[in-house]
């Protein structure tokens, strides 16, 4: 036999219906209905007020909550969210602190609750962190100690044309130096980098993948672009193939760039470039970065103290090195034999030093290219090559 269910409202009405008969005291009825005598008297006083729905439960919420978000702060939070629809609670709180210094704003968790309540944020499943395989080298802490560059994955603008954005950042400050639509060639990349070098000076190193146009399968893994970097005193740093986590800071910026500029894509390359320019300004000057203590990259960034030279000097080698000029076919003349070094080094001067075993190591600037053995074979040092991709389509370059 099921338990008998009772309704508190019906119990209160029944209690006072019996009380009105005059046959029972309020204490007796309270005991019969399983409530305290004090509770029964509370309901008796409420009934005597003449209120129509005296038997209903009342809200137990406090009449005043000192921690409730003030209406003007609530309006400011929602207005800022409309200005920056991609900002989460932490960045909104940081941005509010920048724009209204000295004002105590709600915690980021409270701002998140406000956004959920207003339907401005959807609950998302927690993403599992990928397990890192091997050590991921951290970037330098000094400004311009390392820049990172890469092509964000290509996409098509609404007119059907292909768009290849090249991005360039300072690793330490996260400052986005440039985002430019160019052809994915050595000439296109060099033009953008030279403009950045002239405007902001030279970094100590540049991190990139080892695919074209940044790297090659030649000696030392160098491309013509990397040879130019070495002559400028910039160290090329290649991440392992298929390991984007080794350029994680740059890849994280790409995710934000994609969300804010290419979903959906612009109508043509010129409009898309305008979006990239706007994003760069907001990313550097308005968007707080959690790794920077919720400050902006622009508040940390300073140009390099190494200016772009008017004339690039020849490489310097120790006195124990013999010098050779790489010929037009990528070869050097060594002890009467032609030894192929690499087409990326055509016209460049390399240094050759003898090793203890009688072989000879070939160097260009600070990079070891490979070894010439006793058979006059050049055994080149090169990072592993990423898997081959299909030939790229003709790219669109935004005209300014």
What are these regions (language model features)?
Residues 218, 224-309, 351, 355-356:
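Charged alpha-helix within mobile-element recombinases
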Residues 184, 197-218, 240-242, 247, ...:
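Acidic/histidine-rich, metal-coordinating catalytic segments
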Residues 68, 72, 109, 115-175, ...:
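Mobile-element integrase/transposase regions
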Residues 45, 52-148, 154, 212, ...:
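Basic, flexible linker segments flanking DNA-binding modules
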Residues 15, 29, 40, 51, ...:
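Mobile genetic element proteins and their domesticated derivatives, centered on retroelements
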Residues 284-400:
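C-terminal, beta-rich DNA-binding module of retroviral/retroelements integrases
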Residues 7-24, 74-83:
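Short, amphipathic alpha-helical "recognition" segments used to contact nucleic acids or chromatin
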Residues 1-14, 63-71:
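Short, Lys/Arg-enriched anionic-surface-contact patches
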């Amino acid at each position: 036999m099921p338990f008998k269910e009772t309704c508190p409202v019906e119990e209160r009405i029944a209690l006072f219906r019996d009380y009105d008969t005059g046959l029972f005291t309020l204490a007796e009825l309270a005991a019969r209905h399983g409530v305290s005598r004090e509770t029964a008297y509370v309901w008796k006083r409420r009934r005597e007020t003449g209120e129509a729905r005296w038997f209903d439960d009342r809200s137990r919420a406090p009449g005043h909550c000192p921690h409730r978000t003030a209406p003007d702060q609530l309006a400011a939070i929602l207005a800022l969210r409309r200005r920056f629809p991609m900002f989460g609670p932490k960045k909104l709180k940081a941005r509010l602190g920048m724009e209204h210094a000295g004002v105590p704003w709600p915690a980021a968790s409270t701002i998140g609750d406000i956004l959920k309540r207003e339907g401005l944020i959807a609950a998302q499943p927690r993403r599992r962190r990928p397990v890192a395989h091997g050590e991921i080298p951290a970037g330098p802490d000094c400004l311009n100690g390392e820049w990172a560059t890469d092509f964000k994955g290509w996409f098509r603008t609404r007119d059907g044309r292909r768009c290849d954005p090249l991005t360039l950042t300072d690793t330490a400050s996260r400052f986005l130096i440039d985002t430019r639509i160019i052809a994915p060639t050595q000439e296109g990349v060099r033009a953008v980098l030279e403009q950045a070098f002239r405007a902001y000076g030279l970094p100590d190193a540049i991190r990139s993948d080892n695919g074209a146009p940044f790297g090659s399968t030649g000696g030392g893994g160098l491309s013509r672009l990397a040879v130019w970097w070495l002559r400028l005193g910039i160290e090329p740093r290649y991440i392992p193939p298929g390991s984007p986590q080794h350029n994680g800071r740059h890849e994280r910026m790409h995710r934000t760039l994609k969300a804010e500029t290419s979903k959906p894509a612009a109508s043509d390359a010129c409009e898309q470039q305008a979006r990239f320019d706007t994003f760069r300004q907001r990313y550097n000057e308005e968007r707080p970065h959690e790794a920077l203590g919720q400050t902006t990259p622009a508040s940390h960034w300073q140009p390099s103290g190494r200016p772009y030279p008017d004339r690039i000097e020849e490489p310097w080698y120790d006195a124990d090195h013999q010098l050779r000029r790489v010929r037009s076919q990528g070869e050097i003349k060594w002890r009467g034999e032609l030894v192929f070094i690499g087409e990326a080094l055509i016209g460049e001067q390399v240094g050759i030093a003898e090793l203890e075993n009688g072989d000879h190591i070939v160097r260009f600037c600070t990079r070891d290219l490979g070894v010439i053995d006793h058979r006059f074979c050049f055994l080149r040092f090169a990072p592993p090559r990423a898997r081959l991709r299909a030939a790229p389509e003709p790219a669109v370059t935004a005209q300014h």
